[in-house]
A protein has these predicted regions:
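A membrane-cytosol interface segment of integral membrane proteins
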Residues: 109-155
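Helix N-terminus capping/helix-initiation residues
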Residues: 11, 33-34, 69, 85
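Conserved beta-hairpin
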Residues: 43-84
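Short, solvent-exposed secondary-structure boundary motifs
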Residues: 40-41, 47-51, 94-96, 105
């Protein structure tokens, strides 16, 4: 049962900024050939857009696990999540960040959710995950834990 799902698509400004590859490639290739410049500009921009879309991770919460990108955390090993926005999110991604944490963060998405990992065998003390809906993600994890009848396992 899927309780939450979000794909971390790039923001519009990322696609606009990526479009700067067009004048850059035109500047390089127009002196050689206008056709080569135009074709190269289009191909490079299309490649950048395709890469941004293809590498957009999915955040998902089911009754059994939390998935962030390629990583999976059984719901029984997920601690009580904390949602952070604005300045607090910036601090979590910066000054308060533990180098051992599992990160699925995107620069174009400010809010984050910190999910403690209670598995003693896991080297990551917590996951830090970007999300546009931090309260909904945290609530979905709490609901999944409640539905599973699990309490946070401690190390």
């Amino acid at each position: 049962m899927q309780l939450y799902r979000e794909r971390l698509w790039p923001s519009v400004w990322v696609f606009v900024a990526t479009a700067l590859v067009i004048p850059a490639s035109l500047l390089v290739f127009l002196p050689i050939s206008p056709t080569a410049g135009q074709v190269t500009a289009i191909v490079l921009y299309a490649g950048c857009v395709a890469a941004l879309i293809a590498t957009s991770p999915v955040i998902e919460v089911t009754g059994a696990e939390v998935t962030a990108g390629r990583a999976r955390l059984p719901i029984g090993y997920a601690g009580v999540p904390e949602a952070f926005e604005k300045e607090q999110a910036t601090l979590e991604r910066g000054q308060r960040l533990d180098a051992r944490a599992w990160l699925v963060i995107r620069g174009w998405i400010s809010p984050v959710v910190k999910i403690p990992v209670t598995d003693a065998a896991d080297p990551a003390p917590y996951w830090l995950v970007s999300t546009r809906r931090p309260a909904a993600l945290a609530a979905a994890i709490v609901q999944a834990k409640s539905d599973a009848g699990s309490t946070p396992r401690s190390a």
